[in-house]
Amino acid sequence: MLASAGLLQTSLIWVAYAVAVALVLLVAIITTFTWQSPHERSVTVSIVAIVSLTSLLATVFLLPVDIALVSSTASAHLGAKKDWATPERIDGILLTLKVVYYTLYSFDALLCLIVIPFAYFWYEEYDEVEEEEGTSGAGARFWKAAKYTLGFVFLVLILFLLGFFVPAAGSGNGKHLDLDYFKRLLAANKGEKALTFGVGLLITLGTFLYTLYTGAGLALLPVSLIKSAPSISAPQLSATIATDLEHNRELQRQIEMRNAGRPDGISQKDRRELDALLREERTLVRRERLAAETRGDGRSGVFRAWTKIQAVFRPLKLLGGILLLLLSILVWASMLITGIDKAANSICKEHCGYILGHINVFQPVNWIFVQSAKAFPVDYILMALLVLFFFGSSITGIATIGIRFLWVRVFQIKKGRTSPQALLIATVMLALIILAINYAIAMIVAPQYAIYGTQTFCVNAPRHPGEQPDCREHRDMVRPCSEVFSEPAAKDVCTPTVMSTFLNRVTINWPVFGAIDFWAQFAFLGVFMVVFVTSLFRTPRLNLSELDEEAEVDEEEGLLASTGRRFGATWGDITGRAKNRNGYGTGGGEGSNGRG
């Protein structure tokens, strides 16, 4: 009966994970098709991007499952293992988790280093003219892409060989190795050591991207939601453009009338002015058409209804942005507290990647997770939402900053305008960033919860040798599990999560990775603070010249509005009527243009 109860609990956790992966697949599909350019869509690129994002998010979402499974083996109130949690059952649970982890990590590395580069070169080798003439077939295209991908295959082999043969830097003797927990971390075979080296290197590379893109996105995502309402309604924009267009055509008529009947034709000065007015007229006509599409003219009633629904729910986006802003500040403060605590109180400092024995200062995010774990499955839902928040922040950062080499923008990431090459590169960047997010959440954001979950142990001496300690009458003798406790009861009850063990194994075997990953968190906090303060005091403005360039590329793209009052714009979109505003116009030069 007890064994079946344990099986039921673990099965429910895996079922919840399967549901989460299904939702992750939906998120990956929506993300891919939202950002992909419809005119350059590639089936191969779309499939690779969707599979890659699904696999990477599934890897991160395995952390709540890991925590739930190890926590389910112990009673948090009594500090003892449950009756069904025999050593054999626990070993079976940990083995299953290891198999899933290693499979997903290996698959992620395969995607990032082989599959995605192959898809990139496969798309690059496509030539529409050669395809129509039949001079280039799929076979030739395949071999060209495979030839370029061989470089990444050699890179994978070199990484594996380095990890297999190079001695682990943390294998020397030291004071920090006296504890059994750290000895078990070093007790890894050659294959695991090679895998820890490869993953540690990928996490470190991802940490640099995470510091810049996720740090900026964590501040920009809430602010963008708060400032997301267009500053001028679509009806107001249409009225303004119509006025400017009428004024433009009136000036053209005046020039034509002024030069009518001249034997030598129109003067050079008037010709230059007329050409400028004609260019401006074409721009205004495009803006007028785009504004009409934004209003829903010529669209179905469903589209127009959806536009009005979006306008109605803009206040909810404002509220959601405020809540996410508070969450960002809470996460930032928690990470700062953990970082300072680890830097000051780590039991082994840089020798093991600043592993912290136990939390010495109140850490709000970790406390929230530990307390919410009492109401299953609230903590797992919160962890999933936190992962999605970091993931969404990373996308926001990449979209805002773009794909750059040093300070030069190579690719631009925009909704509905991202090229397949940019989408694949962004997918690799997200892959590396997600690995870094995995480290940050487990080691910095909620360290105690991510390592032992809700597990506790009883320090009361057992009545008979071989029995579990009994704290039913001594609840004050129940202690949270920690790496530094050496009591026999702690060794018997406390089971660390597979993820934390793997990450700690990376940092203790390769301390340079641990040191870089740890100190990069302070750079992450600095980037967040700079972007956060800047975005609060910087009024977003609309670059109409940029919109005109987009309109020339794709004249069917909807136009978001520019300057004015946000709440007046919202009401204008709901009612469908333009509000009179004297003195407003778009023809006053680029200096008067604004971004909504």
Curated annotation (Swiss-Prot):
Keywords: Cobalamin, Cobalt, Glycoprotein, Lysosome, Membrane, Transmembrane, Transmembrane helix, Transport
Entries under Pfam families matching the protein: LMBR1
Composition bias, Gly residues: 584-596
The organism's place on the tree of life at top rank: Eukaryota
Cross-referenced InterPro entries: LMBD1_LysCbl_Transport, LMBR1-like_membr_prot
Protein topology in the membrane: Multi-pass membrane protein
Main location: membrane
Region (Disordered): 576-596
GO BP terms in the entry: protein localization to vacuole
Glycan attachment sites: N543
Protein localization: Lysosome membrane
Transmembrane annotation, as ranges: 13-33, 45-65, 99-119, 150-170, 201-221, 318-338, 353-373, 381-401, 425-445, 512-532
Molecular-function annotations in GO: cobalamin binding
GO cellular component, one term: vacuolar membrane
Function: Probable lysosomal cobalamin transporter. Required to export cobalamin from lysosomes allowing its conversion to cofactors.
Family to which the UniProt record says this protein belongs: Belongs to the LIMR family. LMBRD1 subfamily.
PANTHER family hit by this protein: LYSOSOMAL COBALAMIN TRANSPORT ESCORT PROTEIN LMBD1 (PTHR16130:SF2), LYSOSOMAL COBALAMIN TRANSPORTER-RELATED (PTHR16130)
Protein name: Probable lysosomal cobalamin transporter
